[in-house]
Amino acid sequence: MHRLYPLVLLMLFVYGAAAGEQAMLARVTVYWHSPGSKERIAASGRLLRDGHCAVDPKKIPYGSKIVLPDDQLIAVDTGPAVVQRTAALRSARTPAQRKAIVIDRYFESRREAQSWAASHPNFMTVWVDSPEWAGVNLSEAD
């Protein structure tokens, strides 16, 4: 899979340039629903589900589409570790990685989250398509 990343990134670059998306270096972390907790409500008020993620809403507005090399997510949540970029600062090896945004990908289970994290690099280039940038009403974005 890792051999395909350069090709996928090139394809995303061509698509992103045409669609007006913005490329960003991101430290992608994972979180999951705790079996004992009742609520799965995100900071945006939406019910969390697979395909959602937490972002810094000052950098990536809620409702934005996040395109990873092998999937797409919707920004609906946030948290202090995401805003403070804790994971990027702790695991960075280069100046670019120290400046990376953090995207925290939501999974329904711990097993799914850990499996995905183990099979993907910590840092990756993502494409962000914001409803604000595309002129889409945020309340209509999913």
PLM features: residue spans?
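Solvent-exposed, well-ordered loop and adjacent helix/strand elements within mature globular domains
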Residues: A19-D142
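Hydrophobic h-region of N-terminal signal peptides that target proteins for export
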Residues: L10-A19
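Sec-dependent signal peptide recognition
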Residues: H2-L9
